[in-house]
């Protein structure tokens, strides 16, 4: 197990470029299973979750060529379907949440998939019902195996239908789309997620020969095809990493430029930071965050406390609430952070309280933050990263703290952030990776 040793108080300045979007990468890499032709994907982030998914595809027979650091070619011409029932495959799927996105493509093209309970973040109950109900609506059958506690999902050929998703799940929508593009007939999906990741997946599939309309809305119509062909695709910049860098620039920045962010796909993210008083300048496709000795939290017109709450797109992504909460600890004013979509993503705040942050955890979903206005720096401490987003939030806190901090279990951070210590050290941070 590895840890970060962070010497706090070093200002960050310079230019940084975000990696490719993790969530989009997981979706489009799994979509390569839908064709026996080559698919080239550019701007693939070099992070743990994506690398493990690529290894899993190799295990089932996908030919993978790494053309450069962030460019891959996939060819799923020959797939070992028997391997899907192996203990090794089931064990690997159970430790990688992104593996659930393989089900839709495998079911659509080969009529068979196996699902184990996937792993990932410990952030409460993440339902897979949306995925499974969607597959059932398309005609799939589920057979439970008590011996290894898995479900084998089968269908001779999926059939298009009309369905209303019980929640606008991003991965659920992606999985159902990938299943429906090879189904017989038309499929209509109401209450579909419409994040940029989903839009990108749909555009890639259309370039492969699929017929998907309603892209960027929550009503998708899909005409099933007999087969899809190869294509090339470029992944968007990671909006979550962009938001993380904005948070760092606010807390410890001395003038930071975030390059090539795809501004039109950031949605409400810049505005959420502006509500905390963070100054963000949009210059072409870059964001520039100047040095700010203070930032003042906005208030509502009626004078009530500023509230930041997550919501399905185009609302605020839940993946950035942890970062916004940390930024609020040094703001001038108070903020209510309301995490609606997961019930234990705020439990890391006890570590911030130990560092001197003024936070009241109201319940598993809500926390009130009273900012220090940069008058009192956080204290250094030793922490453990519980999940990707809390991990990066703790890293931001440690960068701003007085003294040297240690963050354990940084594999959680590595799951979502590429060479984070190297890139931040280039801006002036002092972060060392150590083996325990």
Show where each model-derived region lies.
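Short, structured segments at the rim of ligand-binding sites
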Residues: 1-436
């Amino acid at each position: 197990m590895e840890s970060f040793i962070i010497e706090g108080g070093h200002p960050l300045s310079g230019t940084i470029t975000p990696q490719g979007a993790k969530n989009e990468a997981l979706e489009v890499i799994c979509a390569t299973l839908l064709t026996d032709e080559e698919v080239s994907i550019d701007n693939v982030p070099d992070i743990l979750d994506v690398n493990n998914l690529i290894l899993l595809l190799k295990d089932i027979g996908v030919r993978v060529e790494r053309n450069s650091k962030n460019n891959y070619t996939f060819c799923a011409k020959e797939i070992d379907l028997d391997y899907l029932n192996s203990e090794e495959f089931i064990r690997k799927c159970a430790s990688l949440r992104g593996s659930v996105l393989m089900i839709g493509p495998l079911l659509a093209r080969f009529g068979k998939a196996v699902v184990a309970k996937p792993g990932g973040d410990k952030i409460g109950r993440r339902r897979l019902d949306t995925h499974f109900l969607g597959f059932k609506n398309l005609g799939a059958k589920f057979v439970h195996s008590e011996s290894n506690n898995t479900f084998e999902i089968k269908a001779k050929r999926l059939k298009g239908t009309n369905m209303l998703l019980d929640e606008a799940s991003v991965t659920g929508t992606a999985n159902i789309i990938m299943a429906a593009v090879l189904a017989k007939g038309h499929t209509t999906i109401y209450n579909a997620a419409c994040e940029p990741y989903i839009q990108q997946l749909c555009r890639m599939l259309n370039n492969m020969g699929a017929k998907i309309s309603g892209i960027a809305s929550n009503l998708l119509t899909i005409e099933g095809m007999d087969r899809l062909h190869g294509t090339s695709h470029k992944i968007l910049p990671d909006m979550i990493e962009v938001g993380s860098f904005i948070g760092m620039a606010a807390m410890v920045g001395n003038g930071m430029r975030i390059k090539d962010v795809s501004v039109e796909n950031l949605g409400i993210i810049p505005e959420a930071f502006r509500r905390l008083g963070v100054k963000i300048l949009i210059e072409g496709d870059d964001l520039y965050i100047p040095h700010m000795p203070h930032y003042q939290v906005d208030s509502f017109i009626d004078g009530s406390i500023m509230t930041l709450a997550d919501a399905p797109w185009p609302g605020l992504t839940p993946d950035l609430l942890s970062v916004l909460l940390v930024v609020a600890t040094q703001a001038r004013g108070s903020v209510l952070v309301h995490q609606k979509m997961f019930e234990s993503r705020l439990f890391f705040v006890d570590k911030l309280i130990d560092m001197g942050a003024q936070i009241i955890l109201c319940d598993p979903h809500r926390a009130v933050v009273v900012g220090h206005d940069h008058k009192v720096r956080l204290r250094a401490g030793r922490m453990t990263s519980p999940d990707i987003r809390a991990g990066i939030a703790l890293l931001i806190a440690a960068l701003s703290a007085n003294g040297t901090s240690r963050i354990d279990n940084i594999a959680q951070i590595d799951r979502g952030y590429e060479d984070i210590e190297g890139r931040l050290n280039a801006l002036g941070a002092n972060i060392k990776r150590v083996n325990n």
